[in-house]
């Protein structure tokens, strides 16, 4: 599900078929004021927060995640959650790309290369940290076999979300000219 408003604020849930089971990548996107925006480790808010979970997000479970994932280290997590992460936009590049797409244009590759990212993760937690599932539990459930596989999947899915996110925002800026 992709339940974001025209400004890109809301919740997105991606269902991942691993051939053995399903996982869900849950995203909470919010608006940050310029005062709230920082890449420093002491930040308390981020443009997007994520979790990779092995439990299907029912209404109740999604609400539990909504109350905890945006809090990151201050939230409460269980072995159902495999990874916890967060990211901030490159506001300059995100706005540039969404403006170009809204105008029906493709962004200039040189501009993309100058910054290199739409969003940048500022932390990726796994392996039992903050109550998340540890590697042995993940292996017992036959979800992943090697260390850091869940974290790398989470980072990859965050990148995929960033493309969907910027296109969503661009479309809502100008549905008639968006490409």
Annotate each language-model stretch with its function.
Residues 44-179:
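Mixed-charge, Lys/Arg-enriched low-complexity segments
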Residues 2-43:
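Amphipathic, interaction-prone secondary-structure segments
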């Amino acid at each position: 599900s992709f339940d974001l408003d025209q400004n890109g604020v809301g919740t997105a849930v991606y269902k991942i078929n691993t051939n053995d089971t399903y996982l869900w990548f849950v995203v909470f996107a919010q608006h940050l004021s310029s005062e709230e925006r920082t890449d420093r480790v002491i930040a308390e808010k981020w443009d997007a927060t994520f979790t990779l979970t092995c439990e299907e997000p029912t209404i109740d479970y999604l609400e539990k995640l909504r109350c905890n994932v945006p809090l990151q280290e201050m939230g409460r997590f269980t072995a159902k959650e495999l990874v916890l992460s967060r990211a901030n936009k490159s506001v300059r590049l995100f706005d540039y790309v969404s403006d170009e797409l809204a105008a029906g244009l493709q962004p200039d590759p040189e501009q993309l290369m100058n910054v290199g990212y739409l969003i940048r993760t500022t932390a990726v937690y796994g392996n039992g940290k903050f109550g998340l599932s540890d590697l042995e539990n993940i292996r017992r459930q036959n979800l992943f076999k090697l260390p850091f596989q869940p974290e790398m999947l989470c980072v990859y899915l965050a990148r995929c979300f960033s493309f969907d996110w910027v296109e969503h925002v661009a479309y809502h800026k100008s549905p008639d000219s968006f490409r």
